[in-house]
């Protein structure tokens, strides 16, 4: 349980979740859940407790609300991450995270949440109906794609 709700100065905001202060080698997968139903919660728990999930550091179920409720077509987000301490551990950690995400496919929304999409690909799932407009803007104003983005909109 992460319980870090308290008054704090802006300099401490990065500590709220307890992530390491420096980048860490890891592999993660996320699934935007269409609704936070009993079946989706049961699917999350089954995936989290599956033997393959032993390679994961943590799994999270995040309720989405506030401003996200108007722009993100889902009720919750499931996220799994595993640390990759040595390169040899990468295949096992990646397989565990992918298995976790696949187990939640029956409950998945058609879109993905950009902040939790670890690797580029499938811009349609990230940007939805905004993709055509974004492509037009980027093609007109940055055709050489000088402005780097983790999730490019042009092919």
Residue ranges and their predicted role:
Residues 1-155:
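Soluble FAD-dependent oxygen oxidases
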């Amino acid at each position: 349980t992460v319980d870090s709700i308290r008054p704090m100065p802006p300099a401490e905001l990065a500590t709220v979740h307890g992530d390491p202060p420096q980048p860490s080698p890891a592999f993660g997968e996320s699934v935007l859940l269409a609704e936070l139903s009993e079946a989706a919660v049961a699917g999350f728990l089954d995936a989290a407790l599956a033997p393959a999930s032993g390679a994961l550091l943590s799994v999270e179920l995040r309720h989405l609300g506030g401003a996200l409720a108007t722009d993100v077509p889902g009720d919750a987000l499931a996220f799994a991450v595993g640390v990759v301490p040595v390169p040899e551990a990468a295949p096992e950690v990646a397989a565990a995270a992918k298995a976790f995400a696949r187990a939640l496919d029956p409950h998945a929304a058609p879109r993905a949440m950009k902040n939790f999409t670890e690797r580029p690909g499938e811009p349609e799932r990230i940007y939805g109906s905004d993709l055509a407009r974004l492509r037009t803007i980027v093609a007109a104003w940055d055709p050489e794609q000088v402005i780097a983005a983790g999730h490019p909109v042009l092919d």
